[in-house]
Amino acid sequence: MVKPVQVAEGSQTGSSTEETSWKEIIPGPLLLMGAPGVGKGTQAKGIMAAWGIPHISTGDLLRDHRERGTPLGAKATQLMDAGKLVPDDLVNQMVAERLERPDTIRGYLLDGYPRTLAQAEWLDSRLAAIPEGLPLIAVSIQVSYTQLLRRITGRRNCPTCQRIYNVYLQPPKFDMVCDVEGTPLVQRADDVESVFHERMRTYAALTAPVVEHYRASSRFVEVDGEQPAGEVMAGIMAAVARLRSET
């Protein structure tokens, strides 16, 4: 098995030369992976801003097709309203259409897709069929189960200003009230411990095998997600720049 690129704790794009190198590269197709709570949303925003590439998630694609009333959206709506999962082939068709848009020429960031091995294999085949196309770089953000539990179950938000706190990691100044509004903080229904464990079981059953699929590639990056968000971002950018320079 090919050893993945690992980004050590504290890894940063420490010099102006390194910063210039990642700014100048063409990022190509990127995949961001990780369990619920690892911070994919935060990192996705940073990557989009740094490289000017679109963020593509299946949730956004489904909403877009439903709002536009497309045939794919109608099929997906019918299935979801019946409590059924949207099949891989339907999701793949939505992704294929999105990747044809001109804003993906320099690259794009996939988030939440592929979620199954079948989707990963379809994506591999599609990318392999593109003449002179850049290969996919897969980035896996790693956070311990215990830390994820604290991040998710400790999360509280202000219903007035939507400011987010964490009772373990970033508590409010006063007990369970917003620092700005003075409003009592609330916990989302899907942030309770029982729901967290169920989400992690689903992730382990469906998505963890996708991580292992890409781990066998020489273009797999593993990042310590327990570092400060800025250091995680710096590690991702440096690793992608290094791998693209070797392509």
Language-model regions: role of each:
Residues 1-247:
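Glycine-rich phosphate-binding loop of ATP-dependent small-molecule kinases
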